[in-house]
C-alpha cells in the first residue's frame, strides 16, 4: 500500500514537472521577449531589436561577486571586439537596479559601457530557464538572431570568464552575425 501511494505521488510529480522540461529553450526557438530596466536608466525590450539587430543576453548570478566581476570587466575592457558586429549585448541578473549591490552600481564600478539589465521579479530569468534553485540566474549566454530566434546558448561561460569579450566576438563571427558598417 505504502509503495503504491509513493508510486502514485511520484507519477503526479513527474506529470506536473513535465511541462517545465518541455519548455527548455533550445537553438531555433523564439527567444522570450523581455522588458527590463537597465543600468543606463533606459528600459529595453527584445522586441525593439527584432528585424534590426542581433542581441546577446549574458545572464550572471549576482553583482559584485568574483566571477561576475571578471566577466563584466572583460566585456567592459574588450567590448570593442564585440562592437565590430551589428549586435546589442547585455549582461542580466535578478539583482535590483538600484542600491549599493544593484546593477547600476556594479556597472559604474567596472566602467561598463553596455547596459546591465535587472530582473528583480525573476520572470524573465524563468522564461529563459536560467533561474536556479537558490533563486539566482545561471551564468548562461543567449545569442539571438535579428529574427528573434536563439542561434546559440553558451552554458559553459565559466570556462572563459576572463576572456568573455573575445569569446563572444569569436562566437558572433562563427554565427555569421553581420559586421557593423563603418562610415
Question: How would you label these PLM feature ranges?
Answer:
Residues 1-7:
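Positively charged n-region of N-terminal signal peptides that target proteins for export
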Residues 35, 90, 103-139, 145:
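Short, internal strand/loop/helix patches
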Residues 7-17:
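Bacterial N-terminal signal peptides
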Residues 69-110, 122-126:
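Structural microenvironment flanking redox-active thiols in thiol-disulfide oxidoreductases
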Residues 45-69, 73:
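Short active-site neighborhood of thiol/selenol oxidoreductases, capturing the structured segment around
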Residues 47-49, 130, 156:
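Residue-level structural signal for beta-strand termini and adjacent loop
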Residues 21-47, 170:
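N-terminal "domain-start" segment that seeds a small globular fold
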Residues 137-183:
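Thiol-/selenol-based redox modules, centered on thioredoxin-like
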